[in-house]
């Protein structure tokens, strides 16, 4: 039976709610300013500046939460606010959000602040937003000068080519295009190649999100074509063809291609969104089946994505009955990994003790994971969600897993009634371990896996990442067939490594020895020594040497390091370079146009 609610009588309750919302609004203003700055940096081709901006934005949320907590403690002695007041704070906050344009993100910010203040009381659902209180349906910015979430274009009156040109020019990028008419013709040809000639239905139209999506050296136009009952997604990457000159690089017309550029293995986009829920709804319409949590994360709202993921997990637990088990495969020396078979993620915990030869600490491993979070992942390193105080029902934990937890991570678990509380863990997308993929694959799959592995490591080294442990078991194969690195405890910056050749043996005894006859420093790497570990399977060896014979040559690694030390940033593509217009339709490009490209890498 529900009781008549008490009056909201606490002035402190209202003041605290208003203070939290003011701090969220400041956070989101800074978030949007970063996207505006990204446009300027892109136009000026300031790639180092874009990298810096992306790193700073990742840490911005935690900085704003910390500032808000400090303010509440100074102004209201927040830790000692009476428990009867906190529900009033929440209700006042809900009232303040009724016409807000980012209510879901503001609720998550409220939870983050409360977690810092209330500590274990976080589990009191009356104090926080376990479920959303404010609907995000049909939110739109109706201010006169505001951009709509997306713009609708109707090609029937002016023709498709003219409409596509207007779509591009409406973004008002400062640098001129090398040959926009040529690029539009390439888009028209690509659409014809993909779909053939199609009749224009009475509702034929194109919807384009009003803001560009910035990442690495690319700005993406994202939209959908509506024709009859068909919804056709598309993305058009805009790049610098040369200094101060832009070009449309390709058009991506398949959902799988869009899912890859928005995948968990890429860094977050910088995109200006006044109503983020409307952007997410649009993106889900062109990538159905992609979780909202992943989309929020990919557009830079990783805390909102993390919040939604946890809700998805709780929802899944309430609608499933299988048990968490130790993850199959080779056990790691540093991490304990478990999974729920019906849920496509793995849960990773840092062990309390590491056997030799591992020489590291929990703090060092956490620093490695933070490094990856802030680094440009290029589609080759899995993103991780980091959680504290996660309560899992004991009844859903396999007995063997409980024994493993008690043995390997006793400092990280606590029993609370019918729950096991995990103090700290990482969560990643579940992938097929590359060693199992190669072990069980057909000849074509082995060739694909080996080619992808070599490409992944080469792209990582160009991005200043040395994986450390090169074994296949530390890499996974995604649903889209891409090889991604996911074991970070030995990761280093390539520029911190000393690339060395193996010195020749001094005598026969050296040559027969199983131990190195030369000194090895802590940051020395010897690419020649990787071959015995990677080429043991004759089938793998054949394809590896066919595609990546240079992999074991120290000069390849040294050249990448030298370019990094000179401040060079190579070109990476979140799609196959073969899709680029300059490669796909070379007859349309004059010598010296965007096709000069230089060294390419698919990321």
UniProtKB/Swiss-Prot annotation:
Q: Which UniProt keywords apply?
A: ATP-binding, Cytoplasm, Glyoxylate bypass, Hydrolase, Kinase, Nucleotide-binding, Protein phosphatase, Serine/threonine-protein kinase, Transferase, Tricarboxylic acid cycle
Q: What is its EC number?
A: 2.7.11.5, 3.1.3.-
- Active site (record annotation): 383
Name the predominant localization. cytoplasm
Which catalytic reaction applies to this protein?
A: L-seryl-[isocitrate dehydrogenase] + ATP = O-phospho-L-seryl-[isocitrate dehydrogenase] + ADP + H(+)
> What are this entry's molecular-function GO terms?
[isocitrate dehydrogenase (NADP+)] kinase activity; AMP binding; ATP binding; phosphoprotein phosphatase activity; protein serine/threonine kinase activity
Q: Which GO terms describe its biological process?
A: glucose metabolic process; glyoxylate cycle; tricarboxylic acid cycle
Return the GO cellular component terms, semicolon-separated: cytoplasm
Functional summary from the UniProt entry: Bifunctional enzyme which can phosphorylate or dephosphorylate isocitrate dehydrogenase (IDH) on a specific serine residue. This is a regulatory mechanism which enables bacteria to bypass the Krebs cycle via the glyoxylate shunt in response to the source of carbon. When bacteria are grown on glucose, IDH is fully active and unphosphorylated, but when grown on acetate or ethanol, the activity of IDH declines drastically concomitant with its phosphorylation.
Q: Which family does it belong to?
A: Belongs to the AceK family.
The entry's protein name is: Isocitrate dehydrogenase kinase/phosphatase
Organism the protein comes from: Burkholderia mallei (strain ATCC 23344)
């Amino acid at each position: 039976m529900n009781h008549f609610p008490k009056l909201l009588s606490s002035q402190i309750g209202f003041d605290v709610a208003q203070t939290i919302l003011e701090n969220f609004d400041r956070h989101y203003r800074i978030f949007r300013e970063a996207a505006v700055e990204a446009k300027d940096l892109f136009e000026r081709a300031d790639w180092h500046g874009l990298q810096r901006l992306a790193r700073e934005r990742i840490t911005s949320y935690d900085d704003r939460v910390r500032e808000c907590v400090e303010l509440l403690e100074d102004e209201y002695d927040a830790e000692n606010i009476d428990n009867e007041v906190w529900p009033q704070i929440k209700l006042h906050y809900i009232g303040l959000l009724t016409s807000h344009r980012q209510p879901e993100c503001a609720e998550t910010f409220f939870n983050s602040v409360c977690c810092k203040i209330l500590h274990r009381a976080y589990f009191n659902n009356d104090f926080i937003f376990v479920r959303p209180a404010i609907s995000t349906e049909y939110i739109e910015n109706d201010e006169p000068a505001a951009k709509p979430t997306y713009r609708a274009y109707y090609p029937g009156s002016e023709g498709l080519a003219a409409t596509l040109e207007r779509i591009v020019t409406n973004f008002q990028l400062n640098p001129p295009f090398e040959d926009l008419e040529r690029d539009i013709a390439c888009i028209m040809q690509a659409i014809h190649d993909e779909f053939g000639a199609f009749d224009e239905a009475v509702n034929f139209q194109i919807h384009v999100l009003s803001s560009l999506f910035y990442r690495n050296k690319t700005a993406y136009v994202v939209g959908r074509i509506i024709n009859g009952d068909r919804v056709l997604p598309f993305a058009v990457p805009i790049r610098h063809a040369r200094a101060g000159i832009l070009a449309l690089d390709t058009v991506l017309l398949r959902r799988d291609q869009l899912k890859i550029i928005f995948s968990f293995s890429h860094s977050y986009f910088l995109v200006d969104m006044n109503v983020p829920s409307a952007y997410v709804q649009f993106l889900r319409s062109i990538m159905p089946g992609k979780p909202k949590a992943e989309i929020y994360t990919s557009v830079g709202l990783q805390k909102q994505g993390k919040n939604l993921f946890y809700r998805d997990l709780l929802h899944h637990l309430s609608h499933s009955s299988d048990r968490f088990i130790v993850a199959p495969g080779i056990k790691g020396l540093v991490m304990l990994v478990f999974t729920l078979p019906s849920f496509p993620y793995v849960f990773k915990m840092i062990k309390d003790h590491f056997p030799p030869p591992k020489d590291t600490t929990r703090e060092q491993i956490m620093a490695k994971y933070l490094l990856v979070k802030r680094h440009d992942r290029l589609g080759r390193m899995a993103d991780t969600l980091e959680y504290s105080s996660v309560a899992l029902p004991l009844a859903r934990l396999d007995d063997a897993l409980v024994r493993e937890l008690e043995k390997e991570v006793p400092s990280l678990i606590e029993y609370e009634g019918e729950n096991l509380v995990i103090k700290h863990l990482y969560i990643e997308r579940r992938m097929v371990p590359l060693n199992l993929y190669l072990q069980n694959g057909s000849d074509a799959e082995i060739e694909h896996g080996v080619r992808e592995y070599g490409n992944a490591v080469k792209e990582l080294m160009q991005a200043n990442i040395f994986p450390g442990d090169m074994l296949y078991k530390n890499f996974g194969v995604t649903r889209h067939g891409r090889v991604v690195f996911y074991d970070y405890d030995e990761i280093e910056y390539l520029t911190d490594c000393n690339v060395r050749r193996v010195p020749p043996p001094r005598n026969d005894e050296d040559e027969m020895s199983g131990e190195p006859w030369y000194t090895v420093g802590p940051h020395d790497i010897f690419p020649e020594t990787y071959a015995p570990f990677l080429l043991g399977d004759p089938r793998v060896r054949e394809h590896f040497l066919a595609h990546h014979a240079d992999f074991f040559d120290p000069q390849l690694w040294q050249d990448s390091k030298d370019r990094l030390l000179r401040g060079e940033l190579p070109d990476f593509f979140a799609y196959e370079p073969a899709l680029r217009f300059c490669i796909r339709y070379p007859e349309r490009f004059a010598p010296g146009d965007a096709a000069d490209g230089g060294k390419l890498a698919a990321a």
